[in-house]
């Protein structure tokens, strides 16, 4: 089983197992990833390579950030986003909030049943509860920049 930030822990192994179960129960679902609000991958299904998981985490965090901006400007002012969905040629990206500071992203085939994917994701988020909490990274001050 492949995990994100702390390989080998029981929680991460259980989370990976639950993500894999989501794929098995959801026809057309191809990949699943748990990420932090700031785009760090926390856990992924084995079908995603490390590089793909990094890229998907960055994409999903960016989409969620933009969605929060749209909600703050054009929604009820709370800035809350329940979910985001992006259809592209060859697939659909679903993103839902999943605990404090965490998101669940799923890539599905373009002919997948969006309602079923969303429902399965919601069930998983409810099931996971505390497992999907991801506190924001602390600001450790200025970061070193690479020499030119």
Each predicted region: which residue ranges?
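Acidic, low-complexity cytosolic segments
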Residues: 2-29, 38-148
């Amino acid at each position: 089983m492949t995990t994100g930030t702390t390989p080998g822990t029981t929680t991460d192994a259980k989370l990976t197992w639950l993500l894999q179960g989501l794929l098995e129960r959801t026809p057309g679902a191809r990949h699943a990833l748990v990420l932090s609000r700031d785009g760090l991958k926390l856990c992924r299904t084995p079908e995603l390579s490390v590089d793909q998981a990094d890229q998907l985490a960055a994409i999903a965090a960016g989409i969620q950030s933009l969605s929060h901006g749209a909600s703050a400007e054009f929604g009820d002012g709370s800035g809350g986003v329940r979910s985001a969905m992006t259809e592209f040629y060859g697939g659909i990206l679903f993103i839902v909030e999943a605990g404090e500071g965490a998101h669940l992203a799923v890539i599905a085939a373009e002919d997948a049943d969006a309602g079923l994917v969303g429902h399965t994701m919601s069930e998983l988020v409810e099931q996971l509860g505390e497992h999907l909490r991801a506190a924001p990274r602390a600001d450790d001050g200025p970061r070193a920049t690479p020499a030119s």
